[in-house]
Curated annotation (Swiss-Prot):
GO terms for cellular component: cytosol. Its main location: cytoplasm. It is found in: Cytoplasm. The lineage of its organism: Bacteria, Pseudomonadati, Pseudomonadota, Gammaproteobacteria, Enterobacterales. Pfam families: ProQ, ProQ_C. Belongs to the ProQ family. Residues 117-136, 146-175 have a biased composition (Basic and acidic residues). This is RNA chaperone ProQ. RNA chaperone with significant RNA binding, RNA strand exchange and RNA duplexing activities. May regulate ProP activity through an RNA-based, post-transcriptional mechanism. Signal peptide: none annotated. GO terms for molecular function: RNA strand annealing activity; RNA strand-exchange activity. It comes from Salmonella arizonae (strain ATCC BAA-731 / CDC346-86 / RSK2980). Residues 107-177 are annotated as: Disordered.
């Protein structure tokens, strides 16, 4: 007895029970509904074996009967079995309904976890996109070359006229104050420093607006970075 290996986890206990009572427990596939009061039967049949305690048996049974494959097996017309696989009565309707609710709740929890993980991935991707599209530092203006001695000074009027001709007309943009007015496919601009890049609205989310730039890159942008 002292040299018997010890089972450390509920999964190991379930594997042991499936090997010891194959007509009752299964390690994979759809499980058969268990006899009511089977815990006491287990204590009497395997008590002391593999150094198993009542707490380990109870935890293993709880894990086994809450698994999806077991809940799938609890359905109308199914029959409970004892440790030797003998039928012990058909399932009652209330037990079937309870198992159905447990299965629905378990699926809902998994879907919620997946949705949360997807949201975190989208936020991380959006943050990476904003960093990638962050405006570069503006270059300092080149120092004006000094006029060489003896060189003729051009008339100031001509210089001002040429500057006026070269100066681009500054575009005026209207900031987007409410993203609810936007629609998918609408054209707008994304502010990046002193520049504004053309973009198209792809999706409006709670985190901002997903847009696609002319370069083909898509990212989520907050409203304060959008203008018409």
């Amino acid at each position: 007895m002292e040299n018997q290996p010890k089972l450390n986890s509920s999964k190991e206990v379930i594997a042991f029970l499936a090997e010891r009572f194959p007509r009752c427990f299964s390690a994979e596939g759809e499980a058969r509904p268990l006899k009511i009061g089977i815990f006491q039967d287990l204590v009497e049949r395997v008590g002391g074996e593999m150094n198993l305690s009542k707490t380990q048996l109870r935890s293993a049974l709880r894990l086994y009967t809450s698994s999806w494959r077991y809940l799938y097996g609890v359905k109308p017309g199914a029959t409970r079995v004892d440790l030797d696989g003998n039928p012990c009565g058909e399932l009652e309707e209330q037990h079937v309904e309870h198992a159905r609710k447990q299965l629905e709740e378990a699926k809902a929890r998994v879907q919620a976890q997946r949705a949360e993980q997807q949201a975190k991935k989208r936020e991380a991707a959006a943050a990476a996109g904003e960093k990638e599209d962050a405006p570069r530092r503006e270059r300092k203006p080149r120092p004006v070359a000094r006029r060489k001695e003896g060189a003729e000074r051009k008339p100031r009027a001509d210089k001002q006229t040429s500057k006026a001709l070269r100066a681009p007309r500054e575009e005026k943009h209207t900031p987007v104050s409410d993203i609810s007015v936007l629609t998918v496919g609408q054209s707008l601009k994304v502010k990046a420093g002193n520049n504004a890049m053309d973009a198209t609205v792809l999706e409006i989310t709670k985190d901002g607006v997903r847009v696609q730039l002319n370069s083909g890159m898509s990212l989520i942008v907050r409203a304060e970075h959008l203008v018409f």
